[in-house]
A protein has these predicted regions:
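Terminal peptide-recognition signature
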Residues: 24, 48, 85, 124
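C-terminal long alpha-helix characteristic of the crotonase
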Residues: 1-5, 45, 54-102, 109-113, ...
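Interdomain hinge/lid region at the active-site interface
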Residues: 113-117, 123
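CoA-thioester-processing core
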Residues: 1-37, 51, 66, 70
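Structural motif
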Residues: 51-52, 127
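Hydrophobic alpha-helical segments typical of transmembrane helices
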Residues: 20-23, 32, 81-84, 104-107, ...
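Acidic, divalent-metal-coordinating active-site segment for phosphoryl/phosphodiester hydrolysis
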Residues: 41-47
C-alpha cells in the first residue's frame, strides 16, 4: 500500500538499464511508460495497480503472506505446464501472433505427452489432488 515505484534514472542523467526502456512499454500503456521513463516520475501502489504494473496492493504486513499464498497456489499446479505457459507467454509476446500460436501449440503438444498431464487429468476424474513429479 505504501510502496512507490518508478524509473528515476533520467533525473540523474542516465537512462534506465537492464531492459527498463524495452520492458516497461510492453507491460503498461506506452503513454504511461513514456511518462515514467521520460520524466523520472514516481507513482504510488494504487496507480501502479490501476495501470497494470502490479497485480494487487496489500498492506505491508500482508506482503509476505500474500506472496507465499501465490507461490503455494502456483506450486499446486503442474510444474511443466507452468513452465510451458510462462515460456509461451514471455516468448509469444515478442513474436507475431501466428508464431506465438505455433509456439503455444508445440508447447501444449509437449505438455500433454508428460506423466504430469496424465496425473492431472486422472486426479481430476478421480476428484483428488494431483501429485506432480515434473515428468
Amino acid at each position: 500500500e505504501k510502496s512507490r515505484l518508478g524509473v528515476p534514472e533520467v533525473t540523474l542523467g542516465l537512462i534506465p538499464g537492464d531492459g527498463g526502456t524495452q520492458r516497461l512499454p510492453r507491460a503498461i500503456p506506452r503513454c504511461k511508460a513514456a511518462e515514467l521513463l521520460l520524466m523520472g516520475k514516481m507513482i504510488d501502489a494504487q496507480e501502479a495497480y490501476r495501470i497494470g504494473l502490479v497485480n494487487t496492493v496489500v498492506p505491508v504486513e500482508k506482503v509476505m503472506p500474500t506472496a507465499k499464498e501465490w507461490a503455494e497456489q502456483m506450486c499446486r499446479c503442474g510444474p511443466l505446464a507452468v513452465r510451458a505457459a510462462k515460456q509461451a507467454m514471455l516468448r509469444g509476446c515478442e513474436m507475431p501472433l501466428e508464431d506465438g500460436l505455433r509456439l503455444e501449440y508445440m508447447l501444449n503438444a509437449y505438455v500433454t505427452s508428460t506423466e504430469d498431464f496424465t496425473e492431472g487429468t486422472t486426479a481430476f476424474v478421480e476428484k483428488r489432488k494431483p501429485v506432480y513429479k515434473g515428468k
